[in-house]
C-alpha cells in the first residue's frame, strides 16, 4: 500500500514532465516541418 501511495503522489509530477517533453518535441518538429502535422483531408 505504501508503494501505491508513493506512485499516486508522484504521478502528477511525472505526467507534467512527460507532457512538457511531448509538447517540446511537437513544437520543435512543427518548427522544422511546419506542414507535416496538418494533413488536408
Curated annotation (Swiss-Prot):
InterPro entries recorded: PSI_PsaJ, PSI_PsaJ_sf
Residues spanning the signal sequence: none
GO CC field: photosystem I; plasma membrane-derived thylakoid membrane
Keywords carried by this UniProt record: Membrane, Photosynthesis, Photosystem I, Thylakoid, Transmembrane, Transmembrane helix
Family: Belongs to the PsaJ family.
Primary role: May help in the organization of the PsaE and PsaF subunits.
Protein name: Photosystem I reaction center subunit IX
Amino acid at each position: 500500500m505504501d508503494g501505491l501511495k508513493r506512485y499516486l503522489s508522484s504521478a502528477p509530477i511525472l505526467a507534467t514532465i512527460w507532457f512538457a517533453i511531448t509538447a517540446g518535441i511537437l513544437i520543435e518538429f512543427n518548427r522544422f516541418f511546419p506542414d507535416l502535422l496538418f494533413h488536408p483531408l
